[in-house]
């Protein structure tokens, strides 16, 4: 499977390393604004320079590159794994529209553990809510992360919103001078140090608290998930796939 990697930051380098180690993948090039002379693959500054056709693009870059990636993918019928966070509503709509022509996987978190957490939430969130439990999401990341709350925190909220319906996300309680409403789900972000990523869902009821927590101990969990998504797209002609629909 010919892979074109978009983005060569910390995550991109880890993805490239794993791709080189696996026989089922052929890393044909890397698109990055910063060239790395030590990289054994061809380095490109943009997609227009790429001559070989890729079977799949794995994107760990920036939302600003979306239009170029979709244009290349639609032209070459290339599948895309979007593992980038921070897409706007308009950009997500573009991804959905493009998926009518090509196969796309999009997730803010590609780890298997988060996939399991979302499955658990689909089973228990509504029951907790219906029995009067308050729901809060807390996420922690390193001090270099730009977006807040994290895409994964938004994903966890969306999973519960689908099950419960009628919920309202609350990102900042400092401006609210009223009691907590039942339909609210708080989403809070902490930034500091070198935390890879930690997400906690709290169900607070009368005299008891239940917590579901996922902690990433290295970025490798996201790499493995992205490669698994690329393999899963092999037999897909078109469509928009997520952790819920692909596995």
Model-inferred region functions:
Residues 4-7:
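Conserved N-terminal Rossmann-fold NAD(P)-binding element of oxidoreductases
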Residues 10-48, 132-247:
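C-terminal substrate-binding/catalytic lobe of Rossmann-fold NAD(P)-dependent oxidoreductases
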Residues 19, 73, 96-99, 128:
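A generic structural signal for well-ordered alpha-helical segments
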Residues 49-68, 78-81:
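Rossmann-like NAD(P)-binding element
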Residues 61-62, 85, 191:
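Short glycine-/small-residue-rich Rossmann-like dinucleotide-binding loops
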Residues 71, 84-104:
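Rossmann-fold NAD(P)-binding glycine/threonine-rich loop
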Residues 76-79, 101-102:
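A short helix->loop->beta-strand "cap" motif at the edges of active sites that frequently abuts
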Residues 98-99, 103-142:
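Hydrophobic, well-structured mid-protein blocks that either form specific transmembrane helices
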């Amino acid at each position: 499977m010919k892979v074109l990697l978009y983005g060569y930051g910390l995550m991109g380098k880890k993805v490239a390393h794993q791709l080189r180690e696996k026989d089922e993948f052929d890393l044909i090039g890397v698109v990055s604004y910063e060239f790395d002379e030590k990289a054994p693959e061809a380095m490109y500054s943009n997609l227009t320079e790429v001559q070989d056709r890729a079977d799949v693009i794995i994107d760990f870059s920036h939302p600003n590159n979306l239009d170029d990636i979709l244009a290349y993918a639609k032209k070459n019928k290339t599948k895309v794994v979007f593992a980038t966070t921070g897409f706007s509503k308009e950009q997500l709509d573009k991804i959905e529209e493009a998926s009518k022509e090509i196969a796309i996987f999009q997730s803010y978190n590609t780890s298997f553990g988060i996939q399991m957490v979302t499955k658990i939430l689909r089973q228990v969130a509504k029951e907790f809510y219906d029995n009067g439990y308050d729901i809060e999401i807390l996420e922690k990341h390193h001090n270099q992360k730009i977006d807040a709350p994290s895409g994964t925190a938004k994903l966890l909220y969306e999973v519960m919103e689908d099950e419960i319906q009628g919920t309202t996300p609350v990102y900042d309680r400092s401006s609210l001078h009223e009691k907590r409403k039942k339909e609210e789900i708080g989403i809070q972000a902490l930034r500091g140090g070198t935390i890879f990523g930690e997400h906690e869902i709290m169900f607070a009821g009368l005299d008891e608290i239940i917590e579901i927590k996922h902690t990433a101990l290295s970025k490798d969990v996201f790499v493995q998930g992205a490669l698994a998504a690329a393999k899963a797209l092999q037999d897909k002609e078109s469509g928009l796939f997520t952790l819920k629909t692909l596995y």
